[in-house]
Design a protein with these regions (language model features):
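Short glycine/proline-centered loop/turn elements that form peptide/ligand docking sites
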Residues: 28-29, 46-49
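Conserved catalytic-core motifs of GNAT/GCN5-like acyltransferases
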Residues: 40-45, 97-100
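Conserved acetyl-CoA-binding loop of GNAT-fold acetyltransferases
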Residues: 36-41, 90-93
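Acetyl-CoA-dependent GNAT
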Residues: 43-45, 62-63, 123-124
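Vicinal oxygen chelate
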Residues: 1-11, 15-24, 50-52, 63-124, ...
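N-terminal beta-strand motif that seeds the catalytic metal site of vicinal oxygen chelate
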Residues: 1-30, 57, 70-72
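Terminal peptide-recognition signature
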Residues: 33
């Protein structure tokens, strides 16, 4: 995995709790996040898991919340390289688009995990 992709920051979109992203089952979710999204497992029990990639740490939780209502953003070093990594793994990320925030351009793409959590990957 190229180092220039580097996950730098994570934040919630809406009411999503970054340390408790909702999943239906911890085991399959950990498999997806590690094998497909490139995270490393830090800790796990029956209903929760903590994962890390570079400078970013997230949590998964079987907490009764609807994964389809959860979303978060990740700031990465090279959004195009990450898009290629995920495309090669069959994740089917959305197109990379250039947008503006506060008059400054940034690159972005979106992807969903199997339970429905939506991710926004950005490069400022």
């Amino acid at each position: 995995m190229p180092r220039n992709i580097s996950f730098k920051a994570v934040g919630p979109i809406g009411e999503t709790e970054i340390n408790a992203l909702p999943v239906k089952e911890v085991g399959p979710a950990v498999g997806y996040y590690t094998q497909c999204l490139g995270f490393t497992l830090v800790s796990r029990d029956r209903t929760t898991a903590v994962l890390r990639r570079d400078d970013v740490q997230i949590g998964l939780a079987v907490n009764g919340q609807d994964p389809e209502q959860a979303s978060c953003w990740f700031s990465v070093g090279d959004v195009d390289a990450l898009w290629r990594e995920y495309e090669a793994k069959g994740i089917g990320p959305g197109i990379v688009d250039e947008q503006q925030y506060d008059g400054k351009p940034y690159r972005v793409f979106f992807a969903k995990e199997p339970y429905g959590v939506c991710f926004c990957f950005t490069q400022l």
